[in-house]
Amino acid sequence: MDDFQEWAQEYERVKKLNAPLESLPTQIKRCKDPATRAAVVAPDDKRMLLRVADFVVSVSYSCFDLYRDQDVTEYCTGFIISSDKINKKARILTCDDIVSSEADANSKVFIHWQYMPDSPIEGKLLFVSIHYQIALLEIPVDVHSVMPQLEIPSFGSYPNYGQEVFTLARDKDLFLMARRGTIMRAQQGLMFRSHNILVDYGLPDCGAGGPVVDRSGDVVGMSLHGSGISAILSISTAISCIDMWTNFGRIARPLLEMRFKNVELLDEPSGSRLGGFIVDRVDIDSTAWELGIRRGNVISFNGHCSTPLPEFEDFLLSYGLAHLQGKHRVADFKLKVCDHDEDVKRHINLCVPFSDVSEVGLDRLTAASLWLGSYTFFFGNVPTTVICMLNCLLYLQTFVKSVAGLVL
């Protein structure tokens, strides 16, 4: 009986050796994200994107789900933009989803990176800008000590209309996803500001905050999405904000209280002979409104006529930098204003103050206030009672913190 059992075991072992293999190295495994395979076809594109992908991370944060009435963990994407070898710290750029109106900005934010053995690691929020929809995080990691052979990707120039670009994202399992598309010659959607440009791919749910890469492998922007629309923030704008905050602790921008469109994107033949920016919106009671600037006017700032809006935004930030350096107390622009219908031109001086478009250490109430301000900017006025109640709560919160500080 023992001999028979030994023979049966040997028979089963040999049978398994001769069985057909179900998983061969040459077989294509089932794709988790078919859109990624469709986006990256050429081998050169794959190699190029993988070099950037080394620095793409997943960012997790807690937020309150109104429908389920409980805290949940959400994910977005970020990417490493710098590493400090001396202080052993790295900075990560991501979107402002981590401090949205539903998120508690005082809750912990975690960074998931495939090269960190103790991943996830808690990230420190340095600042957030609701205006530019960016957030800067810091982690106690020296990238070059973890992976000495890695080189942080270079930053490219402004993304251009009609340009083909890729974007990268990582989900909660660190699975890499890619999308490919073309920058659209469409005007900005309701969820985005003048300096954002639209793109024709759809981002995955975790794709906001990921890098946008051109065909040369340079990072040219950061991905944003809202209401099913994908957009790009120019990397030059993000870096300008980071440099300004690093050196001065603030991000100064002229308070124009206007939104613009590029006149070159007009479908009408007159778009070719007019130079400047179309005023898409001007706030009532603003300085521009008092000077007679209205929706539909075509204006140029200090001779800037045909500048793409992302480049124009950097021009405005250069005024903010000069202000922080003590060169300007206010922003003084020389405008040429054209009436689109009547072709009437006039020259005026627009003098406006600066605003700080960065926030540090937001709590849930302050984030709600900023969200309400963004809602008002995009969709119009909200009930005055709501604004008054929120302001009262903010003042009460400040008073309580002051009293608590005195007691302590």
What is the predicted function of each stretch?
Residues 77, 201-211, 261-301, 305-307:
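PDZ/PDZ-like domain segments forming the peptide/carboxylate-binding groove
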Residues 57-59, 78, 90, 94, ...:
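Terminal peptide-recognition signature
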